């Protein structure tokens, strides 16, 4: 019997119509062993390093090691539900996290999921957690100031937008307090209509207590700073994998603003705990330990994170991402492995000393070994001129004070230098949650270096400073606006400042 072509065609057509198309084609592997957040998986020979795997329980993992017929994946979160023999699928994607202005005012976990009970994000932009840092040709020099509101930093250790500045010191020396004050200081720029002046903040808490972070978030909400801030939390009770991912997630959130022509500030608190989490993962993966049991690539761990902070050029939108990593030292030992690594990666460090902190100097900055390698280029001329004199007078004061310890008789000029140095040191002290605008800082330091506090008792310096600024705000706001608009102290501004300060000092008896 001979079949007609039309009959064959109709039969094939009917069969194809009844054919169920596979909804999904995926590579599947199986868990050989699971423990301590590390899964050994067989059967996914085409997986690549950094790829996201999907376990049958719904949990996700990241490929960390590739071996013959075997891969090792780090489970993101808890591995309680994963058993030996569980099915694992490739996703053929790397980890992406939600970013955008929708995240402002929110608290998210290490992979960007909201944990503040305010609901899911509606339309976020998803970005890769691990990306290459901008190339040299995409960058511009650091030329815009990042105002911290802290006199000692803005004058002596200035930070620019796009800089990486390390905050380093022993526990309980005020490292987080400085970071929070910097976030609070950005509020004054968000109250203005100039979008270019606004700085969006990302605070990454690594290995901290949830109660501590809750207090911090409450403070940001009370001051109105949460409106332009995102908090990324990976608490001490979270898995090492989440503590490892948190800084990269925070960086990706900041990169959204940087790449869209805006300014962002990301604070990593702190990278010591981040390194410890990575050390734990590496030892569980049986990677060979090096100095202090850290793996050999711990430098790359932090360099690839911090190199993503950048000031982009005009062609790329002139956005910036400023990074403030925090590192905790043991007994002020800055020569330990992680501190020296991060010091060599960053553009300077703010060193906090426990001795100064216990003496009541807050912020407890050691001006001698704190440095900013690129921020001075971003300082406005008015601050640069005053800061130079402040640095010189403080250096002379510390040298002369050390000399006076020997009980030597000092002449009148040396005594005057010591007296002024003491008052300048007192001026640089600052209470927490009290940021100063740049024009206020310039006026305060101008008064200090020109001898207007020489007759003020050291114990009354803070009171004098407060009343002087109040006098300027009420009676001379025009001079403050003039300093900001011109960005330098002209002869006219200088003579006006001298005149106002001379009149104010006539009532000095109450402070002497």
Swiss-Prot record:
Belongs to the ATPase alpha/beta chains family. It is found in: Cell inner membrane. GO terms for molecular function: ADP binding; ATP binding; proton-transporting ATP synthase activity, rotational mechanism. ATP binds at residues 169-176. This is ATP synthase subunit alpha. It comes from Orientia tsutsugamushi (strain Ikeda). Produces ATP from ADP in the presence of a proton gradient across the membrane. The alpha chain is a regulatory subunit. One of its GO terms (cellular component) is plasma membrane. Its main location: membrane. The gene is atpA. The record marks 370 as: Required for activity.
